[in-house]
């Protein structure tokens, strides 16, 4: 991941180890097995985390939210790093991870249960200098090539809406940007969170104001872990009600990420 995106992610991070509530003195029976294990393994994929080039440690809003959850549990945090969402989903399926952060995803629905929303990130487009494209409708024309990350939720949503434009796939956000930079694509599709810092790398590039959907991030627990899900939902609602997530985002001037509304009000 490019250094500018790493800097952005690190700027929005919550204070290291910041708890949302006091760590458990007596283990909650719903998560007693996690407490006994002494750690919670949270699977993240790019760009949910970034690596400090000096220390090699993962950082970012998702990392710090996971750290706050582990602090509430009173256990250590183990970040399990992946390059793509399918890799993270496989991690949960094989019990190599305990939790993920994902939008509602049919690929994970049979192996995991989803919490209330915690983050919201709009889906939109990045266009290079001189482009006449000002909306998704403008981009959906014959001959237009839209670079997108394969199997990403933003890509899946866009593919359902496109009628004429062609998707050109890459495996990571950085590779997708390279397709646009080298003229192998006319537009790049992703989340506003990813596209805004990328636009800084392309003089004159624009991130469109409109959106074609949103990534409503939720925490995901393995199927059959109803106690975990109830506990996670309490954590999520405490985080939103306290303003902790949104205040951290605002304090750092983060672009493209907001705290989700209270409850499960997105309807997704």
Over which residues does each language-model region extend?
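Extracytoplasmic small-molecule ligand-binding "clamshell" domains
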Residues: 23-103, 108, 169, 242, ...
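Ligand-binding cleft/hinge of the Venus flytrap
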Residues: 51-54, 63-76, 115, 140-142, ...
